[in-house]
């Protein structure tokens, strides 16, 4: 077992953190060697397995990420932009693969990740599932095939606790549509229309967000023209798909050169 890649999960007490730890524990290709929480969390100092309501697993939750990362070959990180930037620096010091599922990263955050990627492998994606990454490829292909008479809209739905909008996945799909159109998403993007907005701007890519209940994640890419419509859709019913994808990325990155990668690279799409 000790020759298997060691994985550290950050944000251990969160829903995704717990799912990630369970996924690693259930795997015969990796081992859980660390769990990180923010200072002051009631989980710090507790056995991670017991904190999740199960049997002890011999991994104590810590608020010292550098100590945890030093014994790991990979870090899986679904936290906040500020925490992720800090973890990227520490993972680079430890030369650990850093798998990032955190969303809401701005250009300043991305610049810091670029620096960290000079020293370690970073795999970053707005969504780690196979289905969504296939949808991303399809979105680009359809956008390439259709002319400007087809309007593009991205509609996403998530649970009431999600704090950012549009979702990272929605933006990933929008980027794919923009690439297919040969345009820049920053110029084409229109988010959350309200009031008297006037006619739709030609070439724009619209985003709408729904928040409610316990929706895991739903994404529609709509291509609409006069008299017809194409809808590409992905529905996630279990966040375990993201955890499995993240673990796959952590294992894939073990023999790669430092740099930034995404799930398209991991999946070979």
UniProtKB/Swiss-Prot annotation:
SUPFAM superfamilies: Glyceraldehyde-3-phosphate dehydrogenase-like, C-terminal domain (SSF55347), NAD(P)-binding Rossmann-fold domains (SSF51735)
InterPro entries, sorted: DapB_C (IPR022663), DapB_N (IPR000846), DapB_N_CS (IPR022664), DHDPR_bac (IPR023940), NAD(P)-bd_dom_sf (IPR036291)
Source superkingdom: Bacteria
Record: active site: 158 (proton donor/acceptor), 162 (proton donor)
Coiled-coil portions: none
Disulfide bridge positions per record: none
CDD domains, alphabetized: DHDPR_N
Xref: Pfam families: DapB_C (PF05173), DapB_N (PF01113)
Record-given protein name: 4-hydroxy-tetrahydrodipicolinate reductase
Gene (UniProt): dapB
């Amino acid at each position: 077992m000790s020759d298997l890649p060691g994985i550290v999960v950050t944000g251990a007490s969160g829903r995704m953190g717990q799912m990630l730890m369970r996924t690693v524990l259930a795997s015969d290709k990796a081992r859980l060697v660390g769990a990180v929480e923010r200072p002051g969390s009631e989980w710090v100092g507790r056995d991670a397995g017991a904190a999740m309501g199960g049997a002890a697993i011999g991994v104590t939750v810590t608020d010292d990420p550098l100590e945890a990362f030093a014994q790991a070959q990979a870090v899986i990180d679904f936290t906040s932009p500020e925490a992720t930037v800090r973890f990227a620096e520490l993972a680079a010091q430890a030369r650990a693969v850093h798998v990032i599922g955190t969303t809401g990263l701005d250009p300043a955050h991305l610049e810091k990740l670029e620096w960290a990627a000079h020293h370690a492998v970073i795999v970053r994606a707005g969504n780690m599932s196979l289905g969504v990454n296939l949808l991303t490829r399809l979105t680009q292909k359809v956008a390439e095939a259709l002319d400007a008479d087809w309007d593009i809209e991205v509609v996403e739905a998530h649970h009431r606790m999600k704090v950012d909008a549009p979702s990272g996945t929605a933006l990933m799909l929008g980027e794919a549509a923009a690439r297919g159109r040969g345009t820049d998403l920053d110029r084409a993007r229109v988010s959350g229309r309200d009031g008297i907005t006037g006619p739709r701007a030609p070439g724009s890519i619209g985003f709408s967000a729904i928040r409610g209940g316990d929706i895991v994640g739903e994404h529609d890419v709509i291509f609409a023209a006069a008299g017809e419509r194409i809808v590409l859709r992905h529905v996630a019913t279990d966040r375990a798909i993201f955890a499995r994808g993240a673990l796959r990325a952590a294992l894939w990155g073990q023999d790669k050169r430092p740099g930034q990668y995404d799930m398209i690279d991991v999946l070979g799409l």
